[in-house]
């Protein structure tokens, strides 16, 4: 709008970074002026609106007049489908560029030129896009089949183009209004049972498709909403409730660090992808949340391919004044996105803190076969990482990156989730439950049984983060006897030392210490430790497909059908830290556990062997070390040199009572998850 152009021109007078960015934009525009580059119509348009130099407008007009001579903007492969897909993402992008160019150069065109270009753009883009995705009787797509990022991109960019053409083509006004009325339905899509489609938006905010595609789909919708508001002054655009929760969602799935902002790369995303584009558009829509300013301030210019950066037209126009961005956001340190199965827990919002991210939800399309997988960011590095992804046509995508083998999960007889789930989806999804955060104690439960129910009847993974250790407890049961293995994707130097594995990357370092069902074999002479875990090094492609990297599998030699796994991930303050927690394996009647000693504190952790579903009507009472409880798992902490009976800090997982002698420490008729 003229107002936004005027605002940025005023800001340039006292913001050197904007002046520098404008220099880059003008240079790109001048190159496009010589080449008559359609793909730089946004640069040419901005250059004209800022400088009022008619050369840019004339170039835009020339480019558009040539563009509408094309027979089709369709894609050959898409057009060969039955029925033909007349529109796709490439057309959507062309629609946006055409809309920007047509609107910018409108006043230098004759009425006949306007009409010719408008009719051509309607034929090439508006009618195919809105016709395929929205309008009767030509619509071929539904929200159930293609209601993810493609829907908003194709229909909303087609809608923006229609908005720019409505002076010459009054008939498209009705199409625009139909789109405006339909847009909230995209946000509200509730999923379906018959085709195993996920609900698009979580009640806590955000979209299940991965950060990359969530941001893209939302960005495209917001661009149309802004364009509609700009062309309908004084009219109420209506409410889309999901928008209010997006700043929290984008922030909760990011990891602030020294250098570029990282984000969770579950599914088809990369850790350098960020959501500044959607955040800027939300801010422009009037959502003046300080969290948005904080988020945008974390993003490094140019850190990913499609961003709204200062030296690109949209970033130049929509980056707000960040001088009042808070140092840290006022957000909780944990977040459960239960509808699509993500959780994050962090020890602070400072840069280079520690964050644990867990996923157990739907599998389909951009959502990988990664039920119960996790990522650990520590001291600026995803020290335990996701395997990543690559370009979809490459065989490595379907054969590795999408599959369970590329994630930190448990396999049974070498199998994870069935490969067919990439196309057909997981009929039974994974879940996350019972997120607790009490500062130095955090917990979440992952249930990945459904996606691997062809082999498993129980696939539960508990994450209990106490002080500087994340305890990962696996409760596994299969339909038949076989072999279990634990996969680890690490990002750093991997060194086995006795029963521990040390992983280090710069200032970031963790120790991986398997404790149950067995320790890691103490040496390479694994034949001397026939019952202990042995390890396998597996080569896999790197994300850039330029080489290979190694991930690791810890194998249990025994053939069984029920296992309790317990692995400690020790978060080291420095790679050279020697004062690590001492962990003693302990067992008693119907329980296993640990005694952990560190820095004058003792923590006893107990896992109830009767509480894993093996009892039907009898309750799961155990009496470890003088305690009496039916809890699935519990922990008590107390100062070294004092008695456990005097403990004040308790974690109770799925328990109705905790007693000792004649004293009741906790009681509830129903089993609860409690930190007290």
Explain the meaning of each model-derived region.
Residues 5-9, 13, 17-248:
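Aromatic-lined, polymer-binding surfaces characteristic
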Residues 133, 147, 151, 322, ...:
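Flexible, surface-exposed loop/gating regions in the mature catalytic domains
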Residues 138-141, 165, 208, 212-383, ...:
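Carbohydrate-active enzyme catalytic cores, enriched for enzymes
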Residues 149, 153-156, 339-342, 371-373, ...:
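Short glycine-rich loop/turn motifs
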Residues 384-389:
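Catalytic Cys-His active-site segments of thiol-dependent hydrolases/isopeptidases
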Residues 390-676:
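CBM-like, beta-strand-rich accessory domains located in the C-terminal region of large
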């Amino acid at each position: 709008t003229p107002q936004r152009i005027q605002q940025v021109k005023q800001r340039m007078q006292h913001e050197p970074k904007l002046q520098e960015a404008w220099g880059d934009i003008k240079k790109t525009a001048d190159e496009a002026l010589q080449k008559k580059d359609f793909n730089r119509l946004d640069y040419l348009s901005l250059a004209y609106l800022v400088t009022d130099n008619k050369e840019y407008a004339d170039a835009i007009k020339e480019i558009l007049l040539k563009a509408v001579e094309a027979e089709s903007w369709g894609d050959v492969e898409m057009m060969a489908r039955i029925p033909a897909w007349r529109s796709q993402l490439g057309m959507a992008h062309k629609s946006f560029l055409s809309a920007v160019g047509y609107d910018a150069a409108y006043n230098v065109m004759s009425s006949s030129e306007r009409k010719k270009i408008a009719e051509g753009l309607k034929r090439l883009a508006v009618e195919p896009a809105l016709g395929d995705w929205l309008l009767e009787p030509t619509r071929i797509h539904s929200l159930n089949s293609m209601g993810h990022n493609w829907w908003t991109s194709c229909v909303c960019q087609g809608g923006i183009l229609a908005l720019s053409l409505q002076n010459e083509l009054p008939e498209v006004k009705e199409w625009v209004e139909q789109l405006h009325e339909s847009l909230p339905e995209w946000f509200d899509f509730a999923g379906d049972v018959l085709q195993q489609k996920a609900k698009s938006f979580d009640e806590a905010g955000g979209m299940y498709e991965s950060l990359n595609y969530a941001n893209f789909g939302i960005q495209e919708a917001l661009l149309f909403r802004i364009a509609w508001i700009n062309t309908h002054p004084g009219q109420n655009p209506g409410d889309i409730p999901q928008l209010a929760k997006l700043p929290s969602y984008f922030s909760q799935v990011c990891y602030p660090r020294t250098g570029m902002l990282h984000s969770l790369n579950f599914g088809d995303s990369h850790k350098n992808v960020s959501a500044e584009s959607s955040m800027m558009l939300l801010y422009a829509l009037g959502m003046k949340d300080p969290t948005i300013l904080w988020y945008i301030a974390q993003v490094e210019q140019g850190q990913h391919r499609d961003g709204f950066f200062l030296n690109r037209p949209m970033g130049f126009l929509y980056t707000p004044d960040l001088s009042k961005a808070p140092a840290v956001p006022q957000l909780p340190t944990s977040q459960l996105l239960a509808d699509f199965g993500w959780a994050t827990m962090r020890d602070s919002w400072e840069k280079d803190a520690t964050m644990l991210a867990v996923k157990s939800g739907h599998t389909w399309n951009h959502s990988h076969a990664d039920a119960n997988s996790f990522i650990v960011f520590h001291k600026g590095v995803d020290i335990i990482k996701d395997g990543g992804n690559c370009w979809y046509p490459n065989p490595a995508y379907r054969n590795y990156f999408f599959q369970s083998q590329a994630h930190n999960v448990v396999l049974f007889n070498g199998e994870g989730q069935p490969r067919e789930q990439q196309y057909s989806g997981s009929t039974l999804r994974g879940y996350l439950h019972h997120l607790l955060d009490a500062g130095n104690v955090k917990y979440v439960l992952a249930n990945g049984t459904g996606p691997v129910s062809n082999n498993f009847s129980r696939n539960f993974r508990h994450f209990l983060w106490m002080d500087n250790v994340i305890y990962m407890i696996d409760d596994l049961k299969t339909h038949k006897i076989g072999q279990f293995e634990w996969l680890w994707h690490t990002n750093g130097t991997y060194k086995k030392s006795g029963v521990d594995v040390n992983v280090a990357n710069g200032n970031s370092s963790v120790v991986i210490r398997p404790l149950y069902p067995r320790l890691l074999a103490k040496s390479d002479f694994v034949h001397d430790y026939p019952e202990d875990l042995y390890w396998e090094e597996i080569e896999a492609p790197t994300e850039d497909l330029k080489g290979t990297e190694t991930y690791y599998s810890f194998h249990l030699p025994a053939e069984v059908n029920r296992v309790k796994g317990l692995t400690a991930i020790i978060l080291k303050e420095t790679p050279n830290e020697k004062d690590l927690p001492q962990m003693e394996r302990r067992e008693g009647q119907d329980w296993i556990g640990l005694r952990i000693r560190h820095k004058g504190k003792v923590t006893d952790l107990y896992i109830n062997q009767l509480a894993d579903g093996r009892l039907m009507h009898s309750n799961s009472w155990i009496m470890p070390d003088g305690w009496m409880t039916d809890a699935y798992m519990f922990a008590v902490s107390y100062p070294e040199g004092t008695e456990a009976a005097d403990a004040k800090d308790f974690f109770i997982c799925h328990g109705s009572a905790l007693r000792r002698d004649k004293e009741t420490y906790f009681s509830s008729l129903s089993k609860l998850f409690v930190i007290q």
